[in-house]
Regions:
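Short, surface-exposed amphipathic charged segments that create phosphate/polyanion-binding patches used
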Residues: 260-264, 318-320, 417-425
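Eukaryotic tandem repeat interaction scaffolds
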Residues: 320-321, 327
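Terminal accessory/targeting
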Residues: 1-221, 225-229, 296-297, 328-473
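Metal-dependent polysaccharide deacetylase catalytic core of the NodB/CE4 family, i.e.
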Residues: 186-191, 199-201, 208-315, 327-343, ...
Length: 473
């Protein structure tokens, strides 16, 4: 298949996620897609959003009752399904499902007047006042059932279901694919620091020392304009110590994506600062995003999309714990609660929530993405919590559970992996392409009610070692 082949476009999400031989992605549309779009079910637990050839859909996730998987038919090795799987996956990753709910007051940021007033007053409001205003805005967040808190894997589980259908249609016991992480690592973790205020700038050297004491390198995102002056010497220090420099918004005023023309003007300046800083990555202020506009950016990866956005001003979430491409930009989703949320919204100085998220993500081989602000993390209680997190991450690395990487390293790996191919035939599969020396051939198979992954020869384990996913088809 070539990239413009309609059949490949239909099956693109599955092929790109697993990097498996394209012959195993043999899905076709059953019927014609009906006008309109909405929510439906893909099995008893999963929610999808988009069009279907059945015409059944709901306006909200809670009202979704039609299970499209009941209407799958198989002819030969082809599965005929009543939806476009790549479109459904894109609708979740790019948060297009939020559009219909905004009409009901869900998923939008505060009104322009309220938000303008808040940002005008923000420099004069301490955290103690801001957190109470934010708690008022977030009231009732726990009633939202979709995306699933504290970690949502809807995209990953949809693709696992499709892979299971493919195995049954092809009558094979396993399907080869390129393992998600280099050198056979079970999962991945990145640590990032958004620098919000001048006090955070001053705290960067101390935070680097804390990170280094656990043998961990991280990335620092700096705001180029208005908030504070970015000392060139600090950028040089960050890079010299093996940490990473990235761009954090333009001026963090909350208006980056308000108007297309103004956004393009700002994007040009953001691209300029990315070149000046030697930065490959970006994160917008307050995790604002509009993924359909990312073609204006020149950076390599973005880190602005939460896995679950219930506790952010812009609600939504990408519903995956894996990196994914938005055009040429790689998205590294924020998959764990931010420190500000933990300390000031939940008033929690334990790492219990982080531990829950770590367990859910690592047992499903995903990306652990943490954002800890220098502005909030050096007060004693916060510092103690943060060092407990670092100790846990260091332990996971020693145990071989995570690849502790810089964001730019994940970006480079994921791009290499996307260019690799599996060639050969059953029993003689091989990986070809750039970076293949770090890649591991893996196999997905159905083991009872679970998808099971086995490695050909993972690092640090005997051949045939098994790792299990929590997917139940």
């Amino acid at each position: 298949m070539n990239d413009n082949d309609p059949n490949r476009q239909f099956n693109r999400a599955l092929i790109d996620y697993y990097c498996c031989p394209e012959a195993f992605a043999d899905f076709a549309l059953r019927g014609d897609l009906c006008a309109g779009e909405g929510y439906f079910r893909l099995g008893p637990e999963l929610i999808g959003y988009g069009q279907s050839s059945l015409g059944y859909y709901a306006e909200t996730p809670a009202k979704a009752t039609c299970d499209l998987l009941y209407h799958v038919r198989t002819e030969g090795t082809t599965c005929y399904i009543p939806f476009n799987p790549s479109a459904v996956v894109d609708n979740l990753r790019c948060e297009r499902y939020v559009g219909g709910l905004k009409k009901k007051g869900w998923g939008a940021k505060p009104t322009t007047l309220v938000w303008e007033l808040y940002y005008r007053l923000r420099p004069h409001l301490g955290v103690s006042i801001r957190k109470h205003l934010q708690r008022l805005w977030l009231r009732g967040w726990e009633k939202r059932r979709f995306p699933c808190w504290p970690v949502d894997r809807t995209v990953d589980q949809i693709l696992e279901k499709l892979l299971a259908l493919s195995m049954k249609a092809h009558r094979v016991e396993s399907i080869p694919f390129i393992w998600f992480w280099p050198d056979g690592h079970k999962s991945c973790a990145i640590l990032t620091h958004d620098v919000e205020e001048s006090g955070g700038v001053d705290s960067c050297p101390a935070l680097m020392e804390i990170d280094e004491s656990f043998g961990i390198k991280s990335s620092f995102q700096f705001i180029p304009e208005k908030r504070y002056a970015v000392p060139p010497g600090l950028l040089e220090l960050v890079r010299a110590k093996g940490f990473e420099v990235n761009v954090h918004d333009l001026n963090h005023d909350g208006h980056l994506y308000d108007h297309r023309e103004e956004f393009l003007r700002r994007a040009e300046k953001i691209n300029h600062y990315a070149r000046e800083y030697g930065a490959r990555g970006f994160r917008a202020g307050v995790l604002y995003r509009k993924l359909d506009w990312y073609d204006a950016y020149e950076f390599s990866y973005d880190m602005s999309v939460p896995n679950v956005g219930h506790l952010d001003p812009q609600l939504g979430g990408c519903c995956t714990v894996m990196p994914y491409f938005v055009g040429n930009v790689l998205e590294l989703p924020v998959t764990t609660a931010q420190d500000y949320t933990l300390f000031n919204i939940f008033s929690d100085y334990s790492i219990d929530l982080w531990q829950r998220q770590i367990k859910l993500i690592t047992e499903n081989h995903g990306l652990l993405s943490f954002n800890v602000h220098p502005d909030y993390s050096l007060e004693k209680r916060a510092r103690d919590t943060y060092t407990a997190l670092l100790a846990r991450l260091s332990q996971l690395r020693r145990q071989g559970e995570v690849w502790m990487a810089l964001p730019r390293e994940v970006d480079l790996w994921w791009r290499d992996r996307a260019r690799m191919k599996i060639s050969g035939e059953a029993g003689r599969w091989r990986i070809e392409g750039p970076g293949r020396e770090r890649a591991r051939l893996a196999y997905a198979s159905l083991a009872g009610d679970r998808i099971s992954y086995t490695f050909d020869s993972p690092v640090g384990q005997a051949p045939g070692a098994r790792v299990n996913s929590s997917f139940e088809p």
